[in-house]
């Protein structure tokens, strides 16, 4: 019922807003903008990209990085925050994946071969960008084609072929469009696959993957009106996630989105509707070595498979009103999700554990935002947002004694599980949060090309469905990958962050410098703390004795935390053809309630690159250096990592009109290192000790052939 009400409200508001958008605004002649570089965009046409996972492109952005759990399972990190704290949109659509461990993180729905650009808001994100932006906002834009310039239809497109040596990966895709002045019909098809990854001392097993994608869309444009509709099928097959307790058997997703835009003289009205249905199978036996019993033969009692689903439905309704000294932005938005997951044993039919049952998380939001110019040198952006978050979940259960044994560990575990399930089912599981956000950013143009900047914000985030409704000790944690089991807490408070950011933009004819410093204090930060339930601790210990999971589970709880640091982006043109680029990142994440650091925070790192550009070719030498990370979470039993540096070499040549060949070598010297954000090995592997740090990849020679027609 809330979803139907929201959609009715969307249609009603659009009806009243259309006349407003058509009002005469002849008084508006020009909008002057005073501001700073508040976003960073990586366009795939301008960037040499080797990986299949779009999230890996975040490493080239100031303040950003990724938590890597597999080759297709990168989770965005920004200034120390990651996962659900980062709002990620794919073509304006929010996607909550089916996997309770984020095997299908949002950026996995925008494959590199389909990607046009990836944009991150530097620092404080305006409240108009998305609903919950406590940790930042990222926008992935896929290829959609362009309208033609005449009435006759034209056939255009883009083909993309690639291969790489580190895992024998191959990718082939094609984007095709029929277009004229008013109509755009488009389609996309992609297939990619790879074997296990290599590192200097061996092979990472399992890390293979296979994925295919199909898209079909139509756009119409006439006068001030534009309409678009797109549907897509995103299928992932076998894909290893060695940092997690299971691997991907399949992820089958159906996605749709529609958009209407009216661009008038008074303002711009945008209405979007989007949704997806996602089904996900994962196992602990089909890609990695199955669990072993004491005789080192397959322990059939410990085979596990999980079937998980998610449903997404959402809308955005925004009106941008032009006024004499700036812009007003008004908006309503909604995102409604439903999650289910059940764990079974393919060898024993009666065995099951309901991981999540009809877990709902519905967010309705409204915002008002103002951008204005004060005088000729000062710009101000400010806004407020209200989000109402409604959550609930169904009853759960389990059968951990499928053989009906009269005594023994299965009986005890089943009884303990029943105690947890009964306590959970008898509790009031419905929760409502009323969250308020605000932000303000001031820019002041100074002398010598310098623009000064200061910003402040209050941002909130309600708990995820895992944090509230994980009733039994398990690793369904949204991709934490710390090897710990967790239980949720229904009555968690929303996180509240207060942040301040300062910096400046300084640019001239041959240089640019964009530094930012930030401090963020988070009240009720959701963090795992030692579980106090004797029942949960006992069942976790028994599972650990069976070789499944770890003892001493954590419980999602409200704590106090802070993040601070700086990041800087710079470039300097040594000549008309030679350019030096640099990005540096420093971030600290600390608990304030106890003396401990936060888990999985990116080490300090620096990227230095030297580019030489000719008229039809480009070559780039890049050095990537990471400092040692010994500021580690004792609560999460995090392991320290050492410093390392790698060299990358890449080049591009346009050998024919619209045809480009891109070649590169990553880790040119085949250095051995450990990626702090890649977590730990959870699968049997003769080359990597179980629960030890995942190694960095070895030398990777790659090529991409792109043809635009």
Q: Predicted segment positions?
A:
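Extracytoplasmic beta-strand/coil segments of soluble accessory domains associated
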Residues: 55-97, 122
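Face-selective signature of the C-terminal outer-membrane beta-barrel domain
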Residues: 221-234, 253-422, 427-428, 435-447, ...
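C-terminal beta-signal and adjacent terminal beta-strands/loops
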Residues: 460-461, 523, 528-530, 625-631, ...
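N-terminal periplasmic accessory domains that precede
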Residues: 52-57, 74-77, 89, 105-110, ...
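Outer membrane beta-barrel strand-and-loop segments of large Gram-negative receptors
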Residues: 215, 306-318, 359, 363-367, ...
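Periplasmic-side early beta-strands and strand-to-turn transitions of outer-membrane beta-barrels
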Residues: 139, 144-147, 153-154, 171-254, ...
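Gram-negative outer-membrane beta-barrel transporters
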Residues: 373-380, 388-389, 512, 518-522, ...
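Short acidic/polar hinge/loop motifs at secondary-structure boundaries
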Residues: 94-124
């Amino acid at each position: 019922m809330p979803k139907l009400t929201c959609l009715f409200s969307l249609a009603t508001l659009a009806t009243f807003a259309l006349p407003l958008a058509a009002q005469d605004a002849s008084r508006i002649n020009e909008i002057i903008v005073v501001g700073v570089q508040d976003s960073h965009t990586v366009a795939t046409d301008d960037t040499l990209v080797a990986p299949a996972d779009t999230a890996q492109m975040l490493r080239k952005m100031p303040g950003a990085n990724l938590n890597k759990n597999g080759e297709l399972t990168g989770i965005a990190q920004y200034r120390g925050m990651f996962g659900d704290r980062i709002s990620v949109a794919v073509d304006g659509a929010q996607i909550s994946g089916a996997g309770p461990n984020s095997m299908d993180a949002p950026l996995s729905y925008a494959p590199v071969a389909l990607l046009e650009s990836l944009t991150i808001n530097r620092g404080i994100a305006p409240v108009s960008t998305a609903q919950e932006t406590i940790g930042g906002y990222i926008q992935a834009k896929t290829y959609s084609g362009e309208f033609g310039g005449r009435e006759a239809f034209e056939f255009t497109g883009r083909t993309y072929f690639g291969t790489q040596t580190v895992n024998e990966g191959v990718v082939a895709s094609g984007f095709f469009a029929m277009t004229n002045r008013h109509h755009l019909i488009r389609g996309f098809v992609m297939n990619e696959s790879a074997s296990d990854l290599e590192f200097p001392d061996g092979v990472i097993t399992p890390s293979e993957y296979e994925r295919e994608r199909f898209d079909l869309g139509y756009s119409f444009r006439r006068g001030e009106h534009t309409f678009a509709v797109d549907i897509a099928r995103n299928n992932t097959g076998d894909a290893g996630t060695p940092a997690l307790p299971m691997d991907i058997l399949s992820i089958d997703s159906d996605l749709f989105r529609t958009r209407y835009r009216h661009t008038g003289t008074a303002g711009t009205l945008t209405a979007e509707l989007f949704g997806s249905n996602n089904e996900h199978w994962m196992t602990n036996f089909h890609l990695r070595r199955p669990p072993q019993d004491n005789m080192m033969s397959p322990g059939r009692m410990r085979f596990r498979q999980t079937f998980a689903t998610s449903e997404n439905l959402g809308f955005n309704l925004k009106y941008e009103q032009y006024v004499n000294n700036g812009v007003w932005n008004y908006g309503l938005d909604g995102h409604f999700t439903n999650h289910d997951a059940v764990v079974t044993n393919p060898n024993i039919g009666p065995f099951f554990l309901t991981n999540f049952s009809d877990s709902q998380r519905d967010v309705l939001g409204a915002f008002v935002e103002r951008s204005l110019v004060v005088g000729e040198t000062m710009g101000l952006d400010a806004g407020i947002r209200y989000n109402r978050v409604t959550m609930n979940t169904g009853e759960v259960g389990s059968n951990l004694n499928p053989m009906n044994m009269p005594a023994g560990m299965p009986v005890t575990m089943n009884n303990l599980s029943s105690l947890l399930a009964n306590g959970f089912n008898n509790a009031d599981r419905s929760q409502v949060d009323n969250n308020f956000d605000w932000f303000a950013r001031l820019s002041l143009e100074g002398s010598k090309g310098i623009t000064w900047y200061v910003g402040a914000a209050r941002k909130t985030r309600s708990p995820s469905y895992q944090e509230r409704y994980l009733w039994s000790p398990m690793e369904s944690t949204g991709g934490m990958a710390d090897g710990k089991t967790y239980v949720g807490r229904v009555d968690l408070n929303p996180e509240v962050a207060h942040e301040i950011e300062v910096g400046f933009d300084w640019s001239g004819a041959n240089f640019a410098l964009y530094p930012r410093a930030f401090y963020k204090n988070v009240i009720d930060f959701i963090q795992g703390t030692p579980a106090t339930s004797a029942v949960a601790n006992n069942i976790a210990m028994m599972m650990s004795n069976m070789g499944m999971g770890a003892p001493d589970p954590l419980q999602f709880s409200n704590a106090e935390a802070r993040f601070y640091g700086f990041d800087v982006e710079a470039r300097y043109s040594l000549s008309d053809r030679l350019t030096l680029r640099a990005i540096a990142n420093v971030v600290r994440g600390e608990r304030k309630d106890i003396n401990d650091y936060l888990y999985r925070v990116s080490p300090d790192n620096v990227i230095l690159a030297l580019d030489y550009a000719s008229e039809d070719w480009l070559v780039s030498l890049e050095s990537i250096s990471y400092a040692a990370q010994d500021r580690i979470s004792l609560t999460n039993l995090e392991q320290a990592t050492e410093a390392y540096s790698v060299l990358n070499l890449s080049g591009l040549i346009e050998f024919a009109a619209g045809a480009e060949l891109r070649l590169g070598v990553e880790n040119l010297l085949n250095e051995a290192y450990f990626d702090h954000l890649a977590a730990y090995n959870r699968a049997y592997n003769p080359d990597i000790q179980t629960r030890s740090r995942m190694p960095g990849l070895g030398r990777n020679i790659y090529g991409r052939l792109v043809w635009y027609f």
